[in-house]
């Protein structure tokens, strides 16, 4: 009898995609740099891929299962190098919009002096087109624009020590949510985020229910309701600029 492959996403506990399980957002991610090969994670033998486009993964695009889902749905190759990086000058906040996927996603903001760890994905042209479409880059009313951040603005250091001249990142066109004191609110994970947002807004509860589970169930697939939630973030004064608008 053939032994099961220990390198599959299922075997590694990384098979759950936030697109199918919104409360799992941003999704589980690897502990180290890997090569995503469809349903498997393989050792990554090189960190620089000059024939591909470097894209920082701020939210669920660092989740192998989410990437697998997006590529498989579009019939595009699911082989993607994923490199762990240290990023200087960028923070991870909360998008000022409700996604029809059923969650409130992450979005970057300008954070001089900040240092954090993010995955960088190296995408080929077809993969980049898939991710662009999934983020709404190609439509005027889409949630995100894709921005190029040069090393003079945001420094990206690969886990092998190389510094990149720059990288792309998806910036939310509606800004990010603030923490009540004028600073961007960090994304704590979907369940605690939704619980806090619902507790703080009676109008949000009217639209999406009392619990994170109700929020996800109502939001998922209902673009009109999500648009109302997005407008509510703005009308209640919860949104602020990310500081990255000039790049997108």
Language model segments and positions:
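Glycine-aromatic micro-motifs
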Residues: 1-248
